[in-house]
Amino acid sequence: MAPQRMKNPPHPGLLIKSDLDGLGINITEAAKALDVTRAALSEIINGKRGISAKMAWKLSKAFTNSDPEFWLALQAKYDLSQVGEQCADKVRVLWQPSSLDNEGIEVNSSENKVK
């Protein structure tokens, strides 16, 4: 079984905003430290722009307790939550792996028939 996902994970920009607020750093200072424009950082913080690989790398250098994969994973979870519900009703199963029932008999899960 796949791990459970957050139904509506927050945009990673909210975490950045929270961290900056906690540190008493404004957007202008943070943008300079990250070597990005204030507008670009503001768009991320306000959820209007996603975190790219380059930004993830910069954030991991600025917030040394994180790595780029952390920031990209947050963005991926957010992105998946945004498209998941839109696609769920429009896509049909093409293949599903077989599994064994309680008696060790192989069952095709998509057809619920014993092979």
UniProtKB/Swiss-Prot annotation:
Disulfide bonds: none annotated. Residues 27-46 bind DNA. It holds the Pfam family HTH_3. InterPro entries: Cro/C1-type_HTH (IPR001387), Lambda_DNA-bd_dom_sf (IPR010982), Toxin_antidote_HigA (IPR013430). Residues 16-70 form the HTH cro/C1-type domain. Keywords: DNA-binding, Virulence. This is Virulence-associated protein A'. It comes from Dichelobacter nodosus. The lineage of its organism: Bacteria, Pseudomonadati, Pseudomonadota, Gammaproteobacteria, Cardiobacteriales.
